[in-house]
């Protein structure tokens, strides 16, 4: 099962890459819908509910990781913490650390250098627009490719391998797409990310989830 989903994710990633090669201006067009040209700013702000969501997406992984680590340590020494689903909880945490943590925020965001929409010339910035998968030196760290906030929504993919029926897996998939897409739209409205940043974020988190599952649960497939 894991191998199928990993291959599926890689195939989707390839065709998404081809799609954005064929339509290189799509990112600019999508971002333009969130840009107020008369005010020279993006319509989404960092106050109120949007500000809370942005804060939550940034700091929830820290809070969650601390709780999980304390719980797992406690389960080693305290009987009442020794529950049936300890491995499942650890799996969900590892998916967070590997997908949104390592792959999204460290490998890509800190090393790809893609300038954010608010930084490019088309939206009153001074940087040159770069398509996805093109490494750039215009941004030093915490850059546009891919979307970190959206990865927290796509992290819900981690529940898919743990659910028994196809219907429940589908519900988890839809929930991840809705949550990740919603957080991605929020960041697009703030000028923080392009559409392709959100798309590839979802793909990367999906693939990393099933890789973690293959390593933790299905080693015999490899």
Curated annotation (Swiss-Prot):
Protein EC: 3.1.-.-
SUPFAM superfamilies with a match to the protein in the record: Acid phosphatase/Vanadium-dependent haloperoxidase
Domain of life, per lineage: Bacteria
UniProt keyword Lyase, yes or no: no
Protein's membrane topology: Multi-pass membrane protein
Compartmental location: Cell inner membrane
Its biological purpose: Removes the 4'-phosphate moiety from lipid IV(A) (a tetraacylated precursor of lipid A) and from pentaacylated lipid A, but not from hexaacylated lipid A (as is found in E.coli). Does not dephosphorylate phosphatidic acid, phosphatidylglycerophosphate, or the 1-phosphate group of lipid A and lipid A precursors. Its expression in E.coli confers resistance to the cationic antimicrobial peptide (CAMP) polymyxin B.
The protein's name in its UniProt record: Lipid A 4'-phosphatase
Originating organism: Francisella tularensis subsp. novicida (strain U112)
Gene name in the database record: lpxF
């Amino acid at each position: 099962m894991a191998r199928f989903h990993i291959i599926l994710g890689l195939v989707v990633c390839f065709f998404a890459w081809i799609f954005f090669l064929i339509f290189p201006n799509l990112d600019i067009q999508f971002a333009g819908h969130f840009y107020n040209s008369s005010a020279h700013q993006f319509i989404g702000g960092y106050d109120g509910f949007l500000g809370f969501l942005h804060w939550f997406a940034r700091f929830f992984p820290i809070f969650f990781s601390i709780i999980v680590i304390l719980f797992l340590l406690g389960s080693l020494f305290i009987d009442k913490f020794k529950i049936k689903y300890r491995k499942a909880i650890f799996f969900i945490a590892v998916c967070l650390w590997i997908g949104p943590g390592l792959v999204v925020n460290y490998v890509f965001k800190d090393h790809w250098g893609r300038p954010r929409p608010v930084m490019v010339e088309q939206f009153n910035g001074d940087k040159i627009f770069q398509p996805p998968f093109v490494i750039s030196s215009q941004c030093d760290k915490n850059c546009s490719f891919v979307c970190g906030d959206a990865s927290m929504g796509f992290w819900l993919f981690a529940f898919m391998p743990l659910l028994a029926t196809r219907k429940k897996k589908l519900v988890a998939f839809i929930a991840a797409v809705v949550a990740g897409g919603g957080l991605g739209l929020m960041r697009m409205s703030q000028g923080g990310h392009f559409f392709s940043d959100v798309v590839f974020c979802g793909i990367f988190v999906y693939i990393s989830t099933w890789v973690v599952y293959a390593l933790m649960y299905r080693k015999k497939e490899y």
